Amino acid sequence: MADGLNMGSLTLNDSQHAPAPGGPPSGGRAAYIPPHLRQRQVNANGDGASAPPPGPTGGSWGGPRGPRGGNWANANAPDFNPRGPNGNTNTNSGWTATEAGRPLFNPNAYGNPGHGGGYAGASARGSGDGQWRDGKHIPGPPNPRLERELFGVPNDPTKQNTGINFANYDDIPVEASGHDVPEPVNTFTNPPLDDHLISNIALARYQTPTPVQKYSIPIVMNGRDLMACAQTGSGKTGGFLFPILSQAYQNGPAAPPPSAAGQFGRQRKAYPTSLILAPTRELVSQIFDEARKFAYRSWVRPCVVYGGADIGSQLRQIERGCDLLVATPGRLVDLIERGRISLVNIKYLILDEADRMLDMGFEPQIRRIVEGEDMPNVNDRQTLMFSATFPRDIQMLARDFLKDYVFLSVGRVGSTSENITQKVEYVEDHDKRSVLLDILHTHGTTGLTLIFVETKRMADALSEFLINQRFPATAIHGDRTQRERERALEMFRSGRYPILVATAVAARGLDIPNVTHVINYDLPTDIDDYVHRIGRTGRAGNTGIATAFFNRGNRGVVRDLIDLLKEAHQEVPSFLESIAREGSGYGGRGGRGGRGRGANATRDMRRMGGGMGGPPSYGGGSGFGAPASNYGGGYGGAPSYGGAGYGGGYGGGGYGNPSGSTGPSSWW
């Protein structure tokens, strides 16, 4: 029966079959010989090297059909030669040969097919990517599908557009301190920006730079370090992406370090030129999405790495090439230890939400990344720090990372936007759910509502309560998996679940368009956290409402809350004034751990007395509890936290306690 089997006009006895090497002639029954033994039998019979069956393009097993002639199954195949049969490398790989036989980086091949990581051959980058050729940036062809994914369509509710109060940004005061501060720009034009970046900015429908962008673009383009303190929602991400991408398009890729030579195939170790550090998974993902927008059709490859997600997929992304890396500190340290990322080529270091990273305990990892690895020193890189608040001690720590920097203070920094209408309601804990339902019924679900709670358990419980009350709600917090968090945020952004209950994990830096109402169901213990929470609405000139539930359990922030409301020209309820008068021990200006806003939380410390030489010393003098004009003790010498100030028992008038460490208003 087998003899009669016919497969597509071929039979087992088909005379068209090639005879087995050394076997009977055509037409007889041939004995089956496994492929890996056929060549051996040919050579044993002295018949020479007949052509093996054709293999896949690339020549991995079937003969010299691929560009490298690889044929590991052929005993007579030539030895593998990474420089090709003539001793030259494939120019598509980004390498050229020297007389000494060492390959050199060929920047003109950057972005060609088979050019991975900027240095070694890999898969083509795709139809939407550009190239660097003959010293020029060659943008890739348009990709309509990717364009819709990145930029949306006009009036897309999931994409942020400037709001009705955007023109009022011109009235926001800006203070830039430092010597030779460049003049601000007022439009997205060339110069100083690259034409390709300007076209991507137009695709994003951005028409006018925000105040922070007007100043940060020329500052960074002139090679200066920057510490930028800007009103939340004011375009800080564009403030650092625009200038570093523009310079990348104008200057091209950097040559790899000598240690990168010899890495063929996919690049195992990435050598990014720009590093952006941020505290949370959500924020780095958001920055990465923005980088993809403005790197569209360019040679620059953005990558993102963060904890809580599959490291394998992140490694594969890095292997395909990584020019701009967005990372959380913990995952970056992990990849450095694995030998998969080198910082030796870094030209730009950006710390976003820098104060939050230090508050969250990332200082050891940040110092290791900046000072303990192979990153160029402070004089050989540009360092940019962006945040909505820069308390005094954070500025002192940042001094170690910056050189000759410009301090940029835009608007009422560390404060709130007047685009946000703030309301404070006195609500006891047991009444919060009923008051919340009243608010939701009153305002409806026409916009997005973000509700902040303090604990993960409360986030789950409150979202379940709202669902039972027929309100479409979801929740995110630190115990949710990364996939669950991303799905919840996507459902919230799209409006399918217009109510999101969140812990502080979503408070900082997340840019969620069209959030019209923020409710602080549980007030935070730090006024800076309150600022960042309500900053999720009123972004990019849009207006929003922020409601806070306050009771005597929150009296620790009452004075800072009153000052903040007055600063933003908001109504101050009488019960806040009454509670503030009840005791002077609460509401001390220190905030959490001495990092409170105070009168100078957003001023350039170089313009205050005490000097800036040497590591910080917080001892001596009057301490942090003294009037703002008495920051005695200087900032020279080894770190010291003793004396009558910070950490020295909070003696005397320390830490906002007029009665000393043993008085009736003592913190202890």
From Swiss-Prot:
Residues spanned by motif DEAD box: 352-355
Bias type Low complexity, positions: 81-92
Alphabetized SUPFAM superfamilies for the sequence: P-loop containing nucleoside triphosphate hydrolases
Enzyme class (EC, first level): hydrolase
Gly residues bias (residue ranges): 57-69, 584-597
Listed SMART domains: DEXDc, HELICc
Xref: InterPro entries: DEAD/DEAH_box_helicase_dom, Helicase_ATP-bd, Helicase_C-like, P-loop_NTPase, RNA-helicase_DEAD-box_CS, RNA_helicase_DEAD_Q_motif
A Gene Ontology term for the protein's cellular component: spliceosomal complex
E.C. no: 3.6.4.13
Domain Helicase ATP-binding: 217-408
Top-level taxon of origin: Eukaryota
GO biological process: cellular response to farnesol; cytoplasmic translational initiation; negative regulation of cytoplasmic translational initiation in response to stress; positive regulation of formation of translation preinitiation complex; regulatory ncRNA-mediated gene silencing; spliceosomal complex disassembly
GO molecular function, one term: G-quadruplex DNA binding
PROSITE patterns: DEAD_ATP_HELICASE, HELICASE_ATP_BIND_1, HELICASE_CTER, Q_MOTIF
One Pfam family from the record: Helicase_C
Record family assignment: Belongs to the DEAD box helicase family. DDX3/DED1 subfamily.
Function: ATP-binding RNA helicase involved in translation initiation. Remodels RNA in response to ADP and ATP concentrations by facilitating disruption, but also formation of RNA duplexes.
Record's comment describing the protein's domains: The Q motif is unique to and characteristic of the DEAD box family of RNA helicases and controls ATP binding and hydrolysis.
Protein name: ATP-dependent RNA helicase ded1
Primary gene name: ded1
